[in-house]
A protein has these predicted regions:
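A well-structured
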Residues: 1-278, 290
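Proline-centered turn/helix-capping motifs that create local helix->coil transitions or kinks
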Residues: 146-157, 300-307, 319
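Conserved oxyanion/phosphate-binding beta-strand-loop segments in alpha/beta enzyme cores
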Residues: 149, 153, 204, 314-324
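Short, well-ordered loop/turn elements at secondary-structure boundaries
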Residues: 201, 334-337, 348
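Short pre-active-site segment immediately N-terminal to the catalytic Zn-binding motif
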Residues: 279-284, 339-355
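Catalytic zinc-binding patch centered on the HExxH motif and its immediate surroundings
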Residues: 280-281, 315-336
């Protein structure tokens, strides 16, 4: 099935809540590990539906942020999903406290219970209004940036297209592109600064309500970090400063010399060669065909996978006004279908999409 043909139907959050409540009751009344796992499996089929429909609404909004229907659907999940916090907490607590936990753990991936423990540190019914406010702010910013255009050499263009000129081989072109971007940022500084300020405050408020010193600690739990924490990252930053920064400085000095630049500026950092960095000689369609050849050469499985992705039109890679300006890979779990969004701009980054995403 082509991605554009996947049907969308809003998943009612209240129905999902009832599924959680049923699962919790079943786990508490379970007479064996099998019954616990059966209850979990039934719940996962419902949450898979929620995740699929939510991902579909987000994907279709990001492809066209002017689509009012999918904008509304996306906002529905953003505002209502936090209301599930209470039952999600109760479900994980039930899984952690079941007398059959030892046997259940043996039959699930080792990260399942670790994720329960970390997730419980990130959830609290007291912060539901704050989560809703946070989603609204993030959505406001995403909508603003998707409509963001820059005047450059008499043409209005989205930031995704301007980036091509920010990496141009001509230094004056790069400077002009950076100046154009800076001018628009300055003109909209009140909006951007205000958005950032509100986001910092609501996140700090959430963390304080949950008893954390600041949002950093809560942020690690929200991201599901299992193998490292704030202290380890602080040590890593010191290692970067001590071991990596000097190397990068030497490389940049050598690069500046090879490019004939005496004083490296911000607009020079993204370029490696005086006459400009290599750019694709193929158009998007040709690059995808070469990518298909590559994946077929790697293995039978990767060949079949890229064939499925291309045949199902599971890519949206061309930049255009009104399209969300980033890139991501998501999935529609119910249909076992991944999807990739990117914004080609004629740079080597276009090739990266076919390998990284």
């Amino acid at each position: 099935m082509k991605v554009c043909d996947i049907p969308y139907q809003r998943c009612d959050v209240e129905t999902v809540k009832k599924a959680y409540e049923k699962c919790i009751e079943s786990i508490k009344n379970a007479k064996s590990a099998d019954e616990v796992l059966a209850a979990r499996k039934e719940l996962l089929s419902v949450t898979e539906e929620l995740n699929t429909e939510s991902a579909l609404s987000y994907m279709r909004w990001s492809c066209n942020t002017k689509d009012e229907f999918y904008k509304g659907e996306k906002e529905y999940y953003e505002q209502n999903a936090p209301l599930l916090s209470g039952v999600q907490i109760a479900y994980m607590q039930a899984m952690l406290s079941t007398p059959y936990r030892a046997e259940v753990e043996k039959r699930l991936p080792v990260t399942v219970y670790k994720n329960y423990e970390v997730s419980l540190k990130a959830l609290d019914e007291r912060i539901v209004p704050d989560l809703q406010e946070e989603s609204a702010i993030v959505n406001e910013y995403a909508q603003f940036m998707s409509e963001f255009t820059v005047d450059f050499r008499g043409e209005k263009m989205p930031l995704t297209i301007l980036r091509r000129y920010m990496e141009d081989g001509d230094r004056e072109t790069r400077k002009e592109a950076f100046d154009a971007l800076g001018k628009v940022f300055e003109e909209n500084s009140e909006i951007l600064d205000g958005t950032f300020d509100r986001l910092v405050k609501v996140r700090d408020r959430m963390a304080k309500k949950m008893g954390y010193k600041d949002f950093v600690e809560l942020g690690y739990y929200r991201m599901g970090r299992l193998c490292y924490d704030r202290e380890k990252v602080e040590k890593f930053r010191q290692n970067v400063l001590k071991d990596i920064v000097p190397v990068v400085s030497r490389i940049r000095t050598a690069r500046a010399k090879s490019m004939g630049i005496d004083d490296m500026k911000l607009y020079d950092y993204g370029v490696c060669f005086a006459d400009g960095d290599p750019t694709p000689i193929l158009n998007a369609e040709q690059m995808f065909e070469k990518g298909r050849e590559m994946y077929h050469e790697m293995s039978k499985e990767t060949g079949e996978f890229i064939d499925m992705m291309i045949e199902n039109d599971a890519f949206d890679v061309m930049s255009r006004e009104g399209k969300w300006g980033g890139g991501y890979c998501t999935e529609f779990a119910k249909y076992k279908q991944p999807f990739i969004l990117a914004n080609f701009n004629g740079t080597s980054g276009d090739v990266d999409v076919l390998t990284h995403e």
